[in-house]
């Protein structure tokens, strides 16, 4: 019984982290799906989302506002707006001018953008950890008083619920809306979409904006969950989310969701049963294995040219 | 409507197209024929903005279009298909037709999210147009299939339907009958004629299937080794000695 409770605890922790990985991974996978580049500055967009949320929360506290739902909504909206604008600007400034050039050029441009944003936040906000108020506290406990108890915190429930809502909206948007339809068309054949009169530049911008908005949501959630942020906050999370995207099949949106969850669970199981030190080894080990044996990922489809 | 004047296209040392001229009038089907490698598709690529020609002029409705980017040309109403099928193969048949009307819908993101009456009305209109063209090319039953799973002949017809929902003035078809069986070719034959008769679209096509070309073309241009060889009505072309030589080789 105790073993089962312990297992369930790891599963809950894993799914919590995993769903935020999935939120960030969407940004990688959509951008890759549409213009075939890895946006290495995406982790920084997520970090900036977390900082913006923190600034908004601090500002509201200074104004003496204490009503939690209002604080959360304002923080979320601010983070989404700032991150989306950043995502849009990064594409406009660093990627669009080099689009269509050799594949390495946008990649290097992305790495440059990532370093720039990281250092910008270093300068503007200082390089030390800043505490992030928990805001949502408490939770449920299961199991006997005197032995191991499985707990699920309200924060974790918030993370699940928010992720679920975001993913549902995204899926509906992609499958039903006019812009979602155009996104799919552009990702399949950019040249043809252009010929048919779709403004492909706008669609590409939209992809960056959507990915950045979801990353901002993850930034707020993980900031609260971990309790502190620093300018390097986006780097590892970005790499993890990238791994999740590759694991699920880069370019595939359901793949990013699945990859995030699998990666989160794998990590928490490693920390729970082996050692926390090994969790990065396992996640990047998974990345290597998937690249070796199934380079298209779990849900990615190999491109077959019909002749 | 369309006038190509002394078009030349040079790739390094190779003069792929040399002083080709042709014109397409309103309400007309014009064919471009010639042996393999004659430069037909290169002419097409110049006309549709895929290549920037190295010499000559292309006038569409009186305006020069040579060297303009392809999407600008297509927005003027000059749409093309390619030798190989280029559908959005992982989207459904009807989605292929809806996405082609993206520009015509001209709505913004907000009205989509709020699902305003105006947005719904425009969506409904494009859906109606898609349904009309699906019926027209006989693919209504396939509307919700993935385009990539259709038979080859159906994919070809869907491509033409996708061009037509954009309401073009001039349709350029690059080997539309390639890979079709005789029955399918006959259907295509009728479809192209009806585009001209019923929808007032001019058509330029490249085709190797001579029966198709002779049946439907109002005029034919023959190109050989990048140079114009002959032009005229199907009857004139059929009797032209130069054309016969080029196709059969000199005895």
Say what each PLM segment does.
Chain A
Residues 19, 28-51, 100-105, 179-182, ...:
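Short, non-helical or kinked segments that cap or interrupt transmembrane helices
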Residues 20-28, 41-61, 86, 90, ...:
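Hydrophobic alpha-helical segments within and immediately flanking transmembrane helices
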Residues 1-25, 52, 63-75, 101-105, ...:
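Membrane-interfacial amphipathic/re-entrant helices at transmembrane-helix boundaries
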Residues 97-98, 106-176, 203-206, 269, ...:
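Transmembrane helix-bundle core of multi-pass membrane transporters
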Residues 148-229, 253-258:
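Helix-loop-helix "hairpin" substructures at the membrane interface of multi-pass membrane proteins
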Residues 34-37, 41-89, 93, 149:
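Membrane-embedded helix boundary and interhelical linker motif in transport proteins
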Residues 2-20, 127, 152, 173-178, ...:
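Inter-helical junctions in multi-pass inner-membrane proteins, predominant
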Residues 33-41, 85-131, 173-180, 235-250, ...:
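Short loop segments and helix-boundary regions at transmembrane helix junctions
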């Amino acid at each position: 019984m105790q073993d089962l409770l312990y297992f369930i605890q790891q599963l809950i922790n894993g799914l919590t982290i995993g769903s935020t990985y999935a939120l960030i991974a969407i940004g990688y996978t959509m951008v890759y799906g549409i213009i075939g580049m890895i946006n290495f500055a995406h982790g920084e967009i997520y970090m900036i989302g977390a900082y913006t949320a923190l600034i908004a929360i601090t500002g509201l506290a200074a104004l003496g506002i204490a009503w939690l739902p209002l604080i959360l909504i304002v923080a979320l909206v601010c983070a989404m707006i700032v991150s989306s604008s950043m995502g849009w600007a990064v594409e406009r400034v660093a990627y669009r001018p080099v689009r269509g050039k050799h594949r390495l050029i946008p990649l290097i441009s992305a790495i440059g953008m990532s370093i720039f944003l990281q250092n910008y936040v270093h300068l503007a906000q200082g390089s030390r950890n800043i505490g992030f108020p928990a805001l949502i506290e408490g939770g449920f406990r299961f199991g006997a008083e005197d032995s191991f108890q499985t707990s699920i915190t309200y924060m974790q429930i918030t993370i699940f619920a928010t992720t679920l809502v975001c993913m549902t909206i995204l899926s509906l948007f992609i499958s039903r809306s006019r812009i979602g339809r155009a996104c799919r068309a552009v990702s399949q054949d950019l040249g043809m979409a252009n010929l048919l009169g779709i403004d492909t530049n706008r669609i590409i911008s939209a992809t960056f904006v959507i990915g950045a908005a979801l990353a901002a949501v993850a930034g707020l959630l993980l900031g609260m969950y971990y309790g502190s942020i620093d300018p390097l906050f986006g780097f590892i999370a970005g790499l993890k989310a990238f791994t999740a995207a590759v694991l699920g099949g880069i370019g595939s949106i359901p793949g990013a969701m699945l990859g995030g969850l699998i990666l989160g669970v794998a990590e928490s199981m490693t920390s729970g049963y082996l050692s926390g030190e090994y969790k990065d080894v396992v996640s990047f080990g998974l990345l290597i294995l998937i690249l070796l044996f199934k380079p298209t990922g779990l849900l990615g489809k190999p491109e077959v040219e019909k002749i | 409507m369309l006038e190509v004047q002394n078009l030349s296209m040079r790739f390094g040392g190779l003069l792929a197209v040399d002083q080709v001229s042709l014109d397409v009038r309103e309400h007309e089907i014009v064919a471009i024929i010639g042996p393999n490698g004659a430069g037909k598709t290169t002419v097409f690529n110049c006309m549709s903005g895929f290549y920037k020609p190295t010499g000559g002029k292309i006038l569409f409705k009186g305006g020069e279009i040579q060297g303009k980017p392809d999407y600008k040309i297509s927005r003027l109403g000059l749409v093309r298909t390619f030798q190989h099928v280029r559908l959005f193969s992982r989207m459904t048949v009807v989605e292929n037709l809806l996405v082609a009307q993206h520009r015509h819908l001209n709505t913004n993101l907000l009205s989509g999210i709020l699902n305003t009456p105006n947005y719904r009305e425009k969506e409904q209109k494009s859906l109606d147009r898609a349904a009309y063209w699906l019926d027209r090319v006989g693919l209504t039953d396939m509307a919700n299939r993935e385009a990539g799973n259709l038979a080859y002949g159906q994919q070809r017809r869907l491509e033409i339907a996708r061009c037509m929902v954009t309401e073009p003035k001039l349709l350029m078809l690059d080997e539309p009958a390639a890979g079709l069986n005789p029955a399918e070719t006959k259907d295509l034959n009728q479809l192209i004629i009806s585009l001209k008769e019923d929808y007032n679209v001019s058509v330029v096509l490249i085709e190797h299937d001579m029966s198709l070309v002779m049946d439907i073309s109002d005029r034919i241009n023959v190109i050989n080794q990048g140079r114009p060889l002959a032009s005229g009505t199907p009857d004139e072309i059929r009797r032209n000695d130069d054309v016969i030589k080029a196709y059969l080789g000199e005895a």
